[in-house]
Amino acid sequence: MSSDFPHYNFRMPNIGFQNLPLNIYIVVFGTAVFVFILSLLFCCYLIRLRHQAHKEFYAYKQVILKEKVKELNLHELCAVCLEDFKPRDELGICPCKHAFHRKCLVKWLEVRKVCPLCNMPVLQLAQLHSKQDRGPPQEPLPGAENIV
């Protein structure tokens, strides 16, 4: 049977990395660029999500109460912890103008994204409020020092 099929001795040429055709380099380089661009897009997406979460978390105005002022209409106590406002307290003021201790408001907004007093959505109000802020500049609240 071996006489029916002649035996040929073929050897594959030894192709090194230097002898590869240019098309292979283009494919490898193109794949690397594609993976790099995908990773950049993914990083930008993650940064955008983090930025959006940061905006949602701080959708209220932070101020420090300098002194007790009647013009602020603060109701003199925090509706979340039921403690009186004191000078130098850090306050969080919702876009609906209700004020709370900043720490109380942060804990409240972690659970619910609404104002503790009027149940208005804080994020929707903040978005509407930011659109209205593009108009004439508003003066700071009397008796409060803006920290944001």
UniProtKB/Swiss-Prot annotation:
Keywords: Golgi apparatus, Membrane, Metal-binding, Transmembrane, Transmembrane helix, Zinc, Zinc-finger. GO terms for cellular component: Golgi membrane. Signal peptide: none annotated. Pfam families: zf-RING_2. Gene3D superfamilies: Zinc/RING finger domain, C3HC4 (zinc finger). It is found in: Golgi apparatus membrane. The chain crosses the membrane at residues 24-44. PROSITE patterns: ZF_RING_2. InterPro entries: HRD1_E3_ubiq-ligases, RNF24_RING-H2, Znf_RING, Znf_RING-CH, Znf_RING/FYVE/PHD. One of its GO terms (molecular function) is zinc ion binding. SMART domains: RING (SM00184), RINGv (SM00744). Its main location: Golgi. It is a single-pass membrane protein. A zinc finger (RING-type) spans 78-119. Interacts with TRPC1, TRPC3, TRPC4, TRPC5, TRPC6 and TRPC7. PANTHER family: RING FINGER PROTEIN 24, RING ZINC FINGER PROTEIN. May play a role in TRPCs intracellular trafficking. This is RING finger protein 24.
